[in-house]
Amino acid sequence: MINLTEHLHLITLRRGARRTQASLEGREELGGKAQGLFSVGQVLTDIMACEFPDIRIDIPEMTVLGTSVFDAFMERNQLAEIAYSNLPDARIANAFQRADLPFEVLGELRSLIDGWVTPLAIRSSGLLEDVTQRPFAGVYLTKMIPNNQGDPDTRFQKFIESVKFVWASK
């Protein structure tokens, strides 16, 4: 049995900075990979419940920062010009690291990190990565973090740095 809503959460600015269960109403906030996982999870949930009720599939917990969070990050820090420039990657990454994430989501992100002490994969689910005619798969980096530091402040800082690192990659 699969209960997808226990495993897929969406953080967005449009519906307030809170952990919400992903639903069809929030799918415009999801990039391609997240939408794909959500869709596959829904199909599996329906099939498994009807045809294979005794089989259990474990889906890792996943939290998605909606596109509105990324858009606010870019706009509030005026990063569009530098992000789309021909500057060296190191300069772009440095600008992203100096920028602030939207304050509305920091508390929610902090509570996630406080509750997790397992390794994390921070990945992009950008809309451009999934254009059918010109896929950008693999353009954005994945950042793996051990998330095993004893100090929650250090774990949170490493997590935020990783989010910015992935967003800066291109």
Predicted region positions:
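N-terminal beta-alpha lobe that positions the nucleotide/phosphoryl donor
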Residues: 1-170
